């Protein structure tokens, strides 16, 4: 159970990604199994594959029942196709916990009060190393004088281990650098019990060691509540007891199953395997000559078809032309040629950088000063009203979805979140938000869909019609005068009642006067002229307002003598 962790979501049910995390694939109608046991209240939701995690978002309670798994904790995956009533499943196998415990124990012993003293066989200088210096110690200690790595066979006779440590020494050197839990991406020193960086969200190198240590201390996240099905739990316990009695030496590998109810899950499993391969490649990219096949034409493999490699580097014969003064002159010419190429490339890149800097400076100077002050004021207000920093958003690309229904659901959630964030100051008790679907369509496509593909007006309407079905109740799609579609924060009758009361307080107001009153009540009012005209026309048709047509214009009065509801 320690592999599951809580996932933060938005009000519309979309996961909040970490810094640098990117979404890869999305699937719907997925259930969770821990081992062979069904996890209750997690049997219908969406599954997100990102570059760092596998995220489950529950359809019923997305803010409470959402869970996540770290890709670093997975060893490999196995796909199981469906048969009869059994749905297709993706089995996620975790890494061996015994190896993690050994890593944690080795880290604890390395940070213990043990100092190994050894003499360098090259320069005969005495060195000190934290922890016990054995044959399996990695990385190999390096001499502080000559910089040559120590050979255990040559230095084992001079190794001396002791528990004495200088009390005046720096505590960071006593407990090692790993105890500070430093992030390799932003170099921020995190708390030792945190698995992801607090600043950038990067996965910390000793996250597995931290979790194994917390498990030994019985630490549990109070936000994660996992309840397994009783029948499957009893069967799982009996199978585990039979397995342990049959093989006392072996330990069962923990695994998690993703059950796909609507799709076959093949694309999701392939994307997961590719993501695990990318993580492994990213970790091993700094290793030089890993799995080398040949050195200077000499095959390093033991067999022609085997995957075993020789540890001994073959002897390379030197030619006479590679030694002497001629060889030195040739190497000097090659060095000058390489330096010339390097400097030319550097100058080319510098010229490109300078041209880009001048264009940016020109764009900055041509910008309007008033717009700059407005943006600064908006930023100050956002910092006061929103203490939390903005998290990376999902990139809703059509190619990541299996069908159009799932794509429209995610688009509806994004439109809902975008509308609330843009007009959150207008959604109050004194000023209701109302905007035409045409204006919202233009704003959404210009702000959110450039670079990922614009949506059509029909898709925009279908997405807004899904608000009520998805449980997004703060916005509603209404039709004014049977022809104008608008998105409002309240029912249309409430909006009409507000406008009628406003005209009752200011009788004889024309269209310009009403616009000025609404703007004076709230400087950020989104009552456009078109919306106001449509609402007034609807009130006149329903008999709530009376009009007085004159040469100077049309004046509106509240119908207090012949109300329409009588």
Swiss-Prot record:
Alphabetical UniProt keywords: Cytoplasm, Endosome, Membrane, Metal-binding, Protein transport, Repeat, Transport, Zinc, Zinc-finger
Species annotation: Saccharomyces cerevisiae (strain ATCC 204508 / S288c)
InterPro entries, per database record: GLUE_dom (IPR021648), PH-like_dom_sf (IPR011993), Snf8/Vps36 (IPR040608), Vps36 (IPR037855), Vps36-NZF-N (IPR031558), WH-like_DNA-bd_sf (IPR036388), WH_DNA-bd_sf (IPR036390), Znf_RanBP2 (IPR001876)
Protein known as: Vacuolar protein-sorting-associated protein 36
Membrane topology according to the record: Peripheral membrane protein
GO terms under cellular component: ESCRT II complex; late endosome membrane
Additional comment: Present with 2470 molecules/cell in log phase SD medium.
Any one biological process term the GO annotation gives: protein retention in Golgi apparatus
Subunit composition and interactions: Component of the endosomal sorting required for transport complex II (ESCRT-II), which consists of 2 copies of VPS25, 1 copy of SNF8, and 1 copy of VPS36. The ESCRT-II complex interacts directly with the VPS20 subunit of the ESCRT-III complex. Binds ubiquitin.
SUPFAM superfamilies: PH domain-like (SSF50729), Ran binding protein zinc finger-like (SSF90209), Winged helix' DNA-binding domain (SSF46785)
Function of the molecule: Component of the ESCRT-II complex, which is required for multivesicular body (MVB) formation and sorting of endosomal cargo proteins into MVBs. The MVB pathway mediates delivery of transmembrane proteins into the lumen of the lysosome for degradation. The ESCRT-II complex is probably involved in the recruitment of the ESCRT-III complex. Involved in the trafficking of the plasma membrane ATPase. Its ability to bind ubiquitin plays a central role in endosomal sorting of ubiquitinated cargo proteins by the ESCRT complexes.
Cell location: Cytoplasm; Endosome membrane
Phylogenetic classification of the source organism: Eukaryota, Fungi, Dikarya, Ascomycota, Saccharomycotina
């Amino acid at each position: 159970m320690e592999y599951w962790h809580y996932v933060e979501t938005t009000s519309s049910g979309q996961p909040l990604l970490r810094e640098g995390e990117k979404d890869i694939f999305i699937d719907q109608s997925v259930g969770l199994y821990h081992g062979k046991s069904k996890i209750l209240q997690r049997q219908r939701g969406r599954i997100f594959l990102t570059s760092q995690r596998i995220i489950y978002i529950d359809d019923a309670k997305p803010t409470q029942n959402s869970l996540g798994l770290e890709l670093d904790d997975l060893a490999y995956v196995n796909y199981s196709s469906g048969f009869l009533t059994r749905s297709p499943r993706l089995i996620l196998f975790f890494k061996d916990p015994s190896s993690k415990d050994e890593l944690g124990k080795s880290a604890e012993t390395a940070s213990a009060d043990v100092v190994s003293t050894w003499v360098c066989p090259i320069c005969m200088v005495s060195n000190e190393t934290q922890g016990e210096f054995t044959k399996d110690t990695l990385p190999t200690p390096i001499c502080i004088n000559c910089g040559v790595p120590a050979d255990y066979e040559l230095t084992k006779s001079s190794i001396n281990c002791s528990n004495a440590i200088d009390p005046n020494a720096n505590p960071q050197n006593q407990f090692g650098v790993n105890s500070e839990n430093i992030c390799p991406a932003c170099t921020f020193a995190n708390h030792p019990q945190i698995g992801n960086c607090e600043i950038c969200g990067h996965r910390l190198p000793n996250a597995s060691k931290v979790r194994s240590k917390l498990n030994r201390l019985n630490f549990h996240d109070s936000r994660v509540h996992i309840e397994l099905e009783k029948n499957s739990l009893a069967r799982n316990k009996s199978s585990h007891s039979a397995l342990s009695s049959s093989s006392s030496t072996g330990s069962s590998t923990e695994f998690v199953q993703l059950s796909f109810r609507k799709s076959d899950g093949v694309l999701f499993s392939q994307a997961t395997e590719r993501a695990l391969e990318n993580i492994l490649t990213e970790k091993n990219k700094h290793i030089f000559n890993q799995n080398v096949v040949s050195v200077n034409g000499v095959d390093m493999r033991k067999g022609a078809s085997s995957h075993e490699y020789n540890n001994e580097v073959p002897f390379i014969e030197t030619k006479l032309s590679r030694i002497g003064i001629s060889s030195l002159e040739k190497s000097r010419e090659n060095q000058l040629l390489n330096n010339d190429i390097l400097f030319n490339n550097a100058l080319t890149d510098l010229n490109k950088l300078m041209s880009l800097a001048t264009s940016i400076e020109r764009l900055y100077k041509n910008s309007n000063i008033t717009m700059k002050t407005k943006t600064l004021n908006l930023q100050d207000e956002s910092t006061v009203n929103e203490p939390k920093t903005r998290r990376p958003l999902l990139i809703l690309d059509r190619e990541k979805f299996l069908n159009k229904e799932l794509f429209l659901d995610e688009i509806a959630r994004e439109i809902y979140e975008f509308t609330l964030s843009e007009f959150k100051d207008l959604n109050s008790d004194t000023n209701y938000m109302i905007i035409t679907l045409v204006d919202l369509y233009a704003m959404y496509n210009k702000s959110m869909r450039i670079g990922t593909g614009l949506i059509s007006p029909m898709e925009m309407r279908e997405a807004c019609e899904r608000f009520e079905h998805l449980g997004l109740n703060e916005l509603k799609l209404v039709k004014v005068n049977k022809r104008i579609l608008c998105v409002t924060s309240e029912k249309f009758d409430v909006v009409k009642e507000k406008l009628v009361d406003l005209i009752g307080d200011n009788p004889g107001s024309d269209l310009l006067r009403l616009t000025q009153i609404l703007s004076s009540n709230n400087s950020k009012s989104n009552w456009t002229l078109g919306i106001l005209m449509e609402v007034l026309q609807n009130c006149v048709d329903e008999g709530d307002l009376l009009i007085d047509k004159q040469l100077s214009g049309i004046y509106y009065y509240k119908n207090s003598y012949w109300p329409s509801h009588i």
